[in-house]
């Protein structure tokens, strides 16, 4: 869980001091608090409000916000253990979305409100549009993460960013959920007013919430993938059949190796994208279009690994893995849900294919080989 790429892009396996501090803090918190009982209560419709207060007390929602704006001042790479741990422990909170929303607000020079924040990309998953003056929203959007739990929504329209109070009468909400029973609601906006408006400076990242949301999901997917690998290896070593652990069987070893390999590739792809995001938000040299490419690669790798891992881990566990009594479903239901959110692996593979066609064979190859990983 500690392999990193440093800010210079060198895979030295040594986390920064801030990354280590954040990782230790969030690991201790989730290991103690995200219990089977909490997850079962969440599935039964009870929000994890006490856990949310704990993450607030630890300063996690503002991890990506500059210290001058009241946050921790962490880079995307330094804050990545939070996203990873959300997935590893399957923490049922709008924490990843709040981190992203707060980061965008701070980047645009806007005040970050207290409380959970959801994020919306105008023009995606519906017909929601921001008016020319940037003061009102009209339209409908589906699959909004955690809308019922959030008072605030950050809506991006290319480089314009607005903060919206979801409790106003001009906004309607229809409840929905994903496979993991996480809130994925439908919102209707009828000339809804915006609380504040700002301007992003993320040139070439034309859909910032869509792209960075995909990066966030890729990171949480990697965390869940590593949890699934750990569960599969542990079960294969403990389950004895015909006098020896089933993990000794060659076919199972091959399955586990495939799953671990795909997980490792997804983790490295997300680390590269996190490095690019850190460069962009901290104003270091780098191409924003390179970040878009890196995010696409990360989401493709994470989505494909999720499909493979969910299948393999259930084969390893056999019938017991499909029971509600076993904890495996908390992880695999999130794999099935998150792989499609903010664009499926098929969507982002198409984006990569279009990039290759647009650049031509010589241009695309040069773009790959000239990049510093």
Label the predicted regions.
Residues 1-89, 135-136, 211-373:
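Alpha-helical interface subdomain recognition
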Residues 15, 32-35, 98, 113, ...:
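Serine/threonine-rich low-complexity intrinsically disordered regions
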Residues 41, 92-108:
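N-terminal glycine-rich flavin-associated loop
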Residues 48, 94, 146, 165, ...:
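Poly-acidic low-complexity segments
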Residues 51, 78-82, 97-101, 113-115:
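Generic hydrophobic, aliphatic-rich segments that mediate packing or membrane embedding
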Residues 103, 107-226, 230, 366-373:
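FAD-binding core of flavoproteins
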